[in-house]
Amino acid sequence: MADQLRWDYLSCYGHPHLKTPHIDSLAKKGIQFESAFVQSPVCGPSRASYYTGRTVFSHGSTWNQVPLPIGELTIGDYLRQSGIRTGVVGKTHMRPDLEG
């Protein structure tokens, strides 16, 4: 997942100068969205929705640094069950739920 990336900064969407060959290759083999939306204008809750497949108010992470509840399954949990190694790189504005 690439986030914080403007659609009009990709050559597959017609940027006249920037070249993004790897993302263009993924777009050619997959799906290009012409209209999409996020669950929250705040990045942390929006990422939590991507991770869980749930709306902001159903998973409870309503602001940056508000953790997902312990036991909340994410895409990483499901991928690991299939033997796929996962990791997170970069800022996520997510924290572990230390209080449980």
Predicted regions and their residues:
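Formylglycine-dependent sulfatase
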Residues: 1-100
